[in-house]
A protein has these predicted regions:
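N-terminal glycine-/serine-/threonine-rich phosphate-binding loop
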Residues: 10-35
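Structural motif
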Residues: 11, 33-36, 117, 140-142, ...
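Alpha-helix capping and helix-loop boundary segments enriched in small/acidic/polar residues
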Residues: 16-20, 39, 61, 65, ...
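Glycine-rich nucleotide/cofactor/substrate-binding loop typically near the N-terminus or early
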Residues: 29-133
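N-terminally biased helix-coil "hinge/interface" segments that flank
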Residues: 82-83, 91-93, 123-131, 139, ...
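Active-site phosphate/oxyanion-binding loops
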Residues: 145-177, 183-228
Length: 235
């Protein structure tokens, strides 16, 4: 396998439209068999942090305003990204489900645990949208949820034995796919709670995945530029 870590409309590429950026990324990753590690779309993480800040301050109205703006932004991306009504509808349902989930956190006590769940939605949405787009284009891609294999131990360090065991099985269960789409940065902790790797973002996730499966190459793509660190280069 090759591993490709891609920033989808990264802050460095803020002038790019995120839907067009996703199309550009799709062109880059198709071809050889790859595991593709994606970030959240441009501006999404900042908005999710802003939502969390409002909820910490017990200001659900402020949070809902940002949620609604972000949801509308994604609905606009759907119209630009997909060409068929079937896939537009699938993408809208995906986005609706994630934002309805985010809204549930405006009603109860908000802690660090809830914040990590909210922040994870950016990567979950971007990978879901990318996988749908690739499927619409006729690419045999499969979504491999990072929350099903990426885990940290009780010291908040990656658990390489667990990662390898779970990831190898997931790949074997989907061996007919040409592309595997997964999330960067997010994981579960030793207690099964949604968490994050705290550093390195998608690049760090890509290195952990590469080390787990003995990848031939890891490509780190940012604004159409890339570097190729060793699979054991866990920056």
């Amino acid at each position: 396998y090759e591993i490709a870590s891609c920033l989808v409309g990264s802050e460095m590429c803020i002038r790019d439209r995120s839907a067009q950026r996703m199309k550009d990324v799709a062109k880059l990753i198709t071809g050889d068999r790859k595991i593709v590690v994606l970030s959240a779309m441009s501006g999404t993480t900042n908005s999710l942090v802003e939502i969390s800040d409002y909820l910490y301050k017990k200001n659900p109205d402020g949070a809902n305003e940002i949620i609604n703006k972000l949801a509308m932004k994604y609905m606009g991306h759907v119209e630009e990204l997909y060409s068929t009504e079937e896939y537009k509808q699938k993408a809208k349902e995906l986005i609706k489900s994630h934002f309805e989930y985010i809204r549930t956190f405006t009603k109860d006590l908000f802690t660090l645990f809830e914040e990590k769940v909210v922040l994870a939605q950016g990567e979950l949405i971007s990978t879901g949208m990318m996988n749908l787009y690739l499927n619409e284009c006729g690419v045999k891609s499969v979504l491999i949820p990072a929350l099903d294999y990426m885990r940290t131990d009780k010291n908040a360090e990656p658990d390489p034995v667990y990662i390898k065991e779970k990831l190898v099985k997931l790949l074997a269960d989907n061996k007919d796919a040409d592309l595997y789409i997964t999330q960067g940065y997010i994981c579960r902790n030793a207690y099964g709670e949604i968490d994050n790797l705290q550093r390195g973002g998608s690049d760090y996730s890509a290195s952990l995945i590469g080390a787990a499966i003995g990848a031939e190459e890891i490509q780190i793509w940012t604004c159409l530029l890339y570097t190729s660190p060793s699979p054991r280069d866990k920056r």
